């Protein structure tokens, strides 16, 4: 019993550290790490019927790629913000895509999506690719240019994230 309490306490202390918000803008901030993503690598995604979705199919759109998990409270809190961005910018060539990781099988995730009224595309990710995608905490959100270059990466959630992401989208739309 004491071991369980120690593990729970350690996990509670680790969550704020692991989900601390940071942003990186590859357009304005010099690279400080060789592990930093510069563009979206080919990733294995699936729709909820098990059909593969190729990441190169996102080219030509400004993409907000949000990596999340069903058990992640900050991820769930961001759903309304992502819905609003899809609603506001979807017809202007912006695509919001949620990629669920570490959340079980599609049959487990589908009811979660309906319950949380996710109005943007949600795909199943490959948990083994989290390292390749530099997903170190949930949520991790990438704003990608039309040629799938990383414009900005957000780790965690902050009160400013919605406004900053919207400003990113507007900059990319203005750039053409």
Label for each model-derived stretch:
Residues 23-56:
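N-terminal "domain-start" segment that seeds a small globular fold
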Residues 67-84:
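Conserved redox-active cysteine motifs that mediate thiol-disulfide chemistry
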Residues 93-106, 118-127:
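Thiol-based oxidoreductase modules, predominantly thioredoxin-like and allied folds used
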Residues 58-61, 91, 118-119, 135:
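Active-site acidic short loop of glycosyltransferases
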Residues 61-63, 67-71, 137:
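Short pre-active-site segment immediately N-terminal to redox-active cysteine/selenocysteine motifs
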Residues 111-119, 124-170:
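Thiol/disulfide oxidoreductase modules built on the thioredoxin-like
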Residues 5-16:
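Core hydrophobic alpha-helical membrane-spanning segments
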